[in-house]
UniProtKB/Swiss-Prot annotation:
Keyword terms: Cytoplasm, Hydrolase, Nuclease, Ribosome biogenesis
PANTHER family reported in the protein's UniProt record: POLYNUCLEOTIDYL TRANSFERASE, RIBONUCLEASE H-LIKE SUPERFAMILY PROTEIN
Source organism: Clostridium acetobutylicum (strain ATCC 824 / DSM 792 / JCM 1419 / IAM 19013 / LMG 5710 / NBRC 13948 / NRRL B-527 / VKM B-1787 / 2291 / W)
Protein name: Putative pre-16S rRNA nuclease
Free-text function comment from the UniProt entry: Could be a nuclease involved in processing of the 5'-end of pre-16S rRNA.
Amino acid sequence: MRILGIDVGNKTIGVALSDPLGFTAQGITTIRRKNEEEDIKELKELCEKYEVDTIVCGLPKNMNGTIGFQSEKVLGFCEVIKQNINVPIKMWDERLTTVTANRAMLEADLSRKKRKKLVDKVAATYILQGYLNSI
């Protein structure tokens, strides 16, 4: 059982992968978004390479729990994933994962440049680990 966690942003998609037993998550890459077709192609290749059987996508809800503009964009992209990749998708509340990821990297004393490069992948790891802890 391999689960792929994704943090979908406007410019990048952070990607994390579970271990085969589904206990831990680790960041594997950050996809630089080009266009929908290319983004789906890269995700599909990752799903095939790692034999993924579920995708967990972070849903950026507002602090009061409502669905906002960014959430609508993510939900729309997840519909495109469903149409092109034959893997079930689970949505996971991702409120504050990017803030938490940045805080953890600050505590690790990473430079601003390194944090910027890693933040989406680390956020995807937090999303996936949260999901794994819940199942």
